[in-house]
Amino acid sequence: MTSRYIPQLSFSFYRHRTIRADFSGGQITSDAGLLPLRAFDQRHGLTRSLAERVCDDRDDTRVSHPGLSLFRQRLYQIIAGYEDANDADRLRHDPAFQILADQPLGAPLGSQPTLSRWENSPAPRDLLKLQDALLDWFVKICGEQVRKRGEILLDVDSTDDPTYGQQQLSFFNAGYNQHMYHPLLIFERHTGCLLAARLRRGTAASNARIIPLLLRIVPRLQREFPKARIKLRADAGFALPLLYEFCEFFGIQYVIGIAANSRLQEKAQRLQRRLARRYRRTGHPQRSFSSFRYRAYSWSHQRRICYKAEHTESGTNVRFLVTNLKGRSRSVFAFYNDRGECENRIEEFKNGFAADRLSCHRFRANAFRLLLHSFAYNLVNLFRLQLPSSLRSAQIETLRIQLFKIGARIRETARCIRIHLASGWPFQDLFQAASLCNSS
């Protein structure tokens, strides 16, 4: 039998002794910290619920990689920072990911071609079922919190997803000055959960498809939480009369930005002149809030407009909101400005979970990819909600460093699989706490 040659590397910087390194350490992984997350997933049946929603037409007798295994392989590799399907070829022999995917040790996971075929397989009805799973996870895990709080706060926004090839429905968007997709996202503010993620063509308006998406969410939320108030916030890209009417019909309290026009500016002129006089007298920046009733030509009735006027050395600036909230205009603006947290969630979704890595050719495959990254985000977000308070708002990069990325030697015996974690790991207490929270 021919023995495999294992090259040795030498390092001479250590003055006490010569250092030699090789790759003969055996079954060692750098991602053993994902085990508590996998236990959390198992306890609530999260990834299993995804596989049950996708029709798999393959012959069971000839399938080496079941749909559930592929879901788990893809999600946990995204969470670990291996977002590209090409990474699968390098990780398919990693013992930790074999365990996470519930595959026998030594059985290779799906290759990059296998994952690519799988990502192109879901039908439109499968994508709709998966879209509903985002809401199902929220109801299942966060339902008790919502009932105690009595409020659901929806933050609606769109984001850019640059494209670099001949992807279907990738178009040039003049607003972003690039070829792109234009995903639509809905987050729940209090929990940070992503409730909806819809991929759209690059030229889609910010508010395109918002009503159909809300129709899949709002009635379900009202059935599950009949006593909870639902509120909605969005920027001026969603200043759509149909959206106002939708919110009013379903009893949703909303605050939505609205672009200035001559009629709105005329209504705010008196306050602007007053601030300008005060600024000339004091030399200090001035700010004030007020509101009035207004009806645009396309509106069926008057609505409340809150506005903020500022006067500085740069001149006067006025911003307008349309709302059905009561209370002081200053409080309405404070409530609206808090939607900046949604921008932080989107940044983590795109940068931490690489949700903008939609490089398949077919639009439907990229829509499926967006959902995969959405589930990876939600799995981690739901998991961190039950971590110690110091880590409940931790970004994914922090969780990778302090929890997920830990070296371990994996050894299979006749009775069990033993995972020997690094003795010098500085975050052992966190790992133990997360494991105890999710022990069966």
Question: Where is each model-derived feature located?
Answer:
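Short, surface-exposed basic-aromatic patches at helix termini and helix-loop junctions that form
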Residues: Y244-Q253
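Acidic/histidine-rich, metal-coordinating catalytic segments
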Residues: D157, K227-F238
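Short amphipathic alpha-helical "interface-anchor" segments enriched in bulky aromatics
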Residues: F40, S329-L372, A376-F383
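An anionic, glycine-rich sequence signature occurring as long contiguous blocks
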Residues: R4-I19, Q253-A354, L436-S440
